Amino acid sequence: PPTDEARTLRDAARELAGDDPAAQAAVALADCAVDADAFIAELTEPETTVAETAALAERAVELARRTGDPLAESAALDALTGAHCWAGAAFEAAATARGRTGLLSSVQVSPASAYELVDALIMASDTSVAVGDLRGAERWGRQLRDLPLLAETGQIATSRLLVADALAGNAGEALADSERFLEAWVRSGRRRSPSLSIAAAAVAMVHGLRGDGGARARWLDIAAELGATRERSAGFGPTFDAVVLLHHGQAAPALERLATEPDELGKWASWVWLHWYAAMRAEAAVLAGHPDAPGRLAAARTIVAGNPVTGAIVDRAEALLGDDRGRLLATAAAFDAAGCRYPWARTLRLAGGDQATTGAAALAALGLAPMSAGIGG
């Protein structure tokens, strides 16, 4: 409903709640949506600051926990996850999302619990991507994909695993699941769903890495039809495009695609894609020979601190700038440890020598096109 109507309903509920714990918890949860933007919705100008939003969400969690109802607590933890996201606290958001899945692990699937179970897995996967825990993102995404209650909505079921697999370089798995995604979406009437546009863009990236420009264009069209507007895709769109462009040695176009300063991307980029965007921006600056590459590396390092994957991307870029082959190979090991087959293979290819041969073979085994050099391109 419109904000004014929602506020009126919330105020009426507050008057009726009295001392009932469940009613008080429900009203506190409503505060998170009516006055704040804790649920990552469409409010352009929420009435609360980031700190106030977090305080509202923490109060909602406290009141929900008192009820002993795991579904009420799950909904409040969702609000707290969103509050952490807007605060730029990606690791706290991921920890809260994981806690939510743990809370729901013993809850039976029912009409009452279905939404919370699905949304908890979605948020756990999304926030895991944000902090570079791709194995975690794959685990939550696989659970989502295999949920019986999503058997007939494959576009939702596969959406998070598609993103995790694409980033890790699991091209074969991503392409297989993309068929289920597309079939289910078409069967649904090609409904607009902006949150699913990221998955379509991720599939487009995989096709781009495979050198299939036609398939990439088709999936980018699907992403646009799903709702990947300029604002919505400000983080993932340039990031995915840059991955493809750099793979094919087009560093200058990649740098141009990443021209926006990270702190100017807007809210839709801030909660999952900020680390990835900043890291790719730094690498593109190095490979394109940008005069401020050291400055962009330093800025990116501050943003990605603690993220094992995007931190390794920044390390790789710094190694390339300093022509430090030993450090470059160390980043390859970091990618391997994180389960990131494509970044690992790409790094070996960039290292040259015998490792380049190993990297090229690994890229071929993943079904991806050969890399171009692209330094200064």
Task: Walk through the language-model features, giving the residues of each.
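Flexible inter-repeat linkers and adjacent short helices
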Residues: 1-79, 86-107, 117, 200, ...
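Conserved short loop/turn motifs at secondary-structure junctions
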Residues: 81-83, 126
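Hydrophobic, helix-rich cores of sensory/ligand-binding and other regulatory modules
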Residues: 73, 110-113, 154
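Inter-helical turn/loop segments and adjacent helix faces that build the functional surface
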Residues: 107-111, 188
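Helix-coil-helix junctions within alpha-helical repeat/solenoid scaffolds
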Residues: 9-24, 100-101, 125-152, 156-377
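Residues within HEAT/ARM-like alpha-solenoid scaffolds
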Residues: 23, 112-119, 194
